[in-house]
Amino acid sequence: MNTKYIFVTGGVASSLGKGIIAASLAKLLQARGLRVTIQKFDPYINIDPGTLNPYEHGECYVTEDGAETDLDLGHYERFLGIHTSKANNVTTGKIYHTVITKEREGAYLGKTVQIVPHITDENKRRMLLLGKTGDYDVIITEVGGTVGDIESQPFIEAMRQLQWELPEEDFLSIHLTLIPYLKAAQELKTKPTQHSVQELQALGVHPDIIVCRTEKELSPELRHKIALFCNVKPGHVIQSIDAWSIYQVPLNMEAENLGKMVVDKLEIPGLPEPDLEALKAFLERLKHPLHEVDIALVGKYVELQDAYKSIQESVVHAGAANSCKVRVHTLQAENINDGNADEVLGKMDGILVAPGFGERGLEGKISAVKYARTHNVPFFGICLGMQMAVVEFARNVLGYAEAASTEVNPRTPHPVIDLMEDQKSTTIKGGTMRLGAYKCRLAEGSLARSIYGTEEIAERHRHRYEFNNAYLRQMQEAGLKVSGVNPDTGLVEIVEIPSHPFFIATQFHPEYKSTPEHPQPLFVHFVKACMDRR
């Protein structure tokens, strides 16, 4: 069987959920026994989102091989339970960088380098790249942006060319659009969708399936109207109605017959019925919890829902694993101090201090750590959260009042968190942090070892600063146990306080490897500790 290529575009408005639709379709195909992966093409000129402010772009998701990518790759991995890579996220910046580098090397033999064919050819090469590995039966490509945006037109043009270069049964186009509901008229309006599809068709791409995001049910008459004016088969207009959980969307799409439509169009015979039992069991636990807890998520970017997307989803997975409803209270670190910590955090069953960069909000994070440590509240720190746990311990247990990270105070007399040695000569910001999966050896008898149930793990990282091992002995003697280290470098990966009911913090980002069917163990045990306290 030839590799099949599916493209998902969006129209009318942004943030309709192309990534969720792409991941849901991938789940339906995977459940039928196909090998599927998803790639995201982003139209911005940044090489990657690694240097983007979370307020600009939401979470930066890190893959196993150390790529800093769009947060949609997190959805892909969570829905499919697979690892993506740097090849799964392409930006306009990467495309231009490749083409300009080739031009400087003389690869174009003196030709004038243009959007068409040089940029579009590179787009096509990247779109087909994963398919040529032989590892996948189906490649789903999510095209970022909204049809009509000037930035994404080279991607659409590459799609147009592939639509005619590939065999008809190997190419499929899905267009996700919005059907707004006007309360005054009490009507769903199809005109924006008609115009969006017409604009896509004017660019030479003819969608095979139209997925309509809607608050209300689409009547058969409306579906027929959309099909008529958008030139698709009547049965190929489907609805994606608002769901109570994003993990319900694959089941909704299966009920809409999306999986069968795609398989039939791509002419893939002999597939079994989809096996979605594990997903259904997860949703059953999620929908009917037996317990409930309240957890504080203390961060710097809490105003934007997507800034801590993987953490939020990991908590959902852990809650379902414990049959527990977890209410996450996102708290701005800048608003927390020693004086109000009891008022702000006193009703919480657990405290999670989130990752981040820079000085803003650090003292609030330290106050949150102190409250959790001194009031026996279950505590979980991630990346910067671990670093602030170390600073808090140094200040309030070791008595080093001026202890700090050199990230914010290069002249501190007690640099308990310091810049990694191999980072001190780095001047370029993009893609130069310690990124991707690294091994961590767990100490025998530690909480971390009991949680993971193994001696060695591999987790993903995104940081420049580390625990200063010059303070290792003092910290351990005072009660902060180092329970996880990198076996090659000795870099401290996990700290915990054995005398505390549950106090653990990691330099790595465990949230990047949690899925509904395989929830991350640290999150599962953190939620369990919160339940035990309640």
Feature names for model-found ranges:
Residues 10, 40, 214, 241, ...:
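Active-site proximal loops enriched in glycine and acidic residues that flank catalytic Cys/His/Asp
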Residues 16-19, 23-27, 31, 344-439, ...:
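Cysteine-nucleophile active-site neighborhood
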Residues 56-64, 243-247, 353, 374-380, ...:
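Short beta-alpha connecting loops at secondary-structure transitions
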Residues 271-274, 380-381, 400-406, 449, ...:
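Acidic/polar loop patches that form or flank catalytic/metal-binding clefts of enzymes
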Residues 304-307, 320-324, 338-341, 360-364, ...:
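Extended hydrophobic-aromatic, low-complexity segments
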Residues 435, 439, 443-534:
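C-terminal and late-domain segments of enzyme folds
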